Amino acid sequence: MCSGRYNLAGQKKIGQQKSSDLLSRRRDDEKISFPPSHSQKMEPIRISYFSDVLCVWAYIAQIRLDELKTTFQDKIAIDYHFVPVFGNAHEKLEKNWRDKGGLKGYSDHVQNVARKFEHIIVHPDIWMGAIPSSSMSCHLFLHAIHLLEIKGIVEPSEKVFEKAIWAFREAFFTKLANVSDRTVQFAIAEELNLPIAAIQAQIDSGEAYAQLSKDFDLVKDLTVSVSPTLIFNEGRQRLNGNVGYRVIEANIRELLHNPPDEQSWC
């Protein structure tokens, strides 16, 4: 599901105070843990971010990820994964929007959503031109690019994986590019000055498929069905759909404030 619905699952209330009577009943010899001092180096908060390249809500949410990285820098680490909401785009939209105007109805829906957010541009004929057959083709190609980073074929500090994800989204939503087509994918890679032969090698070897399969396993294990979805705190907290930046920020600040081994209060 490419969802704009805002949903919180399994998270603690921000700023919740522990009652004094409960504190008084704690055993005298029980240790109370405090946040580490500034001199101590904390491991970054790992955020698993699931999205579909063709999802308008993930397109909208990119600015929030950028702001998180600017605000928290090395205090967070975002792991990008893909959920195939539009794995069979044609049939999905034709079936789900049959009684709501078909592809034209979905196009109107996406444009109405986009008008509410000034930081994005959506082509007026979105989902009406050369419609991508499957987002999975995009995700496979993007994993091939990610492998270039992992193997050091491209400089990891250049963040080409993140840049490529955005380039695919921008090409689709602003230019109606059929990003599921391999020729279009290579054209985008060339614009990013990426080594085409090396990307093809990751696909030909099966390694990119293996990375995509790992995403499928994670989607199943973590029951991810919405794009975008953020999962952190070792799977205990998740934010689904169109979640505002301040909500995401508050959750991260809580995790940074509390030591990793702090026990939950009942």
Which residues does each PLM region occupy?
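Basic polycationic patches enriched in arginine
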Residues: 5, 25-27
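Intrinsic-disorder-associated, low-complexity terminal segments enriched in Asp/Asn/His/Tyr and depleted
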Residues: 6-7, 21, 38
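Polybasic, lysine-rich low-complexity intrinsically disordered segments
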Residues: 12-14, 18, 31, 41
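Short, basic, low-complexity termini and linkers enriched in Ser/Thr/Gly/Pro
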Residues: 19, 27, 36-37
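C-terminal cap of thioredoxin/glutaredoxin-like
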Residues: 45, 49-54, 59-80, 156, ...
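Structural alpha/beta surface segment adjacent to cysteine/selenocysteine redox centers
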Residues: 62-173
